[in-house]
Amino acid sequence: MKILLVHRQTKTVDKIKSVLSSCNPVVLHTESGLDGLLTSRIEHFDVIICGTDLPVVTGFELIRSVRTNSINRQTPVVIVCDEVDDKTIHLGQALDVLAMLPTKELDGLAEIVIQQVKVTPDRDWSELTSGSKAL
């Protein structure tokens, strides 16, 4: 499972990686929304997990751009924020977000990812293992 993790707080990033360790993920971490946005435009991920208070480009701007101009248009997104309020819920719904979690409830993240994220095989890897091409 390939995960793009865009969050600037080291403590939260470490907690997310720890919670998801049972999924054996490959996690690519960026601290700024701009780096996350650029990464999402060139590489496919099975899920994107992002914070809302990112430098340069906010989490909501990142998701909006991913949904309109990215190879990850259909990729599930989980928002991690300090507090989930009405504004966050409405923005998340408008951006078709899979889930919104407060940082204090990160233990539920693994369950959400395991139950609702479909892992897509890497096309290049499946071509190599299918036996259709000679090496």
Task: For the regions a language model picked out, list residue spans one by one.
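Conserved acidic segment of CheY-like receiver
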Residues: 1-11, 16-20, 48, 78
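Acidic catalytic/metal-coordinating carboxylates
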Residues: 32, 58-61
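Active-site beta3 strand of CheY-like receiver
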Residues: 43-54
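His-Asp phosphorelay/catalytic-motif detector in bacterial-type signaling
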Residues: 44, 71-76
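Alpha4 helix (beta4-alpha4-beta5 surface) of REC/receiver domains from two-component response regulators
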Residues: 61, 81-101, 107, 111
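CheY-like receiver
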Residues: 121-135
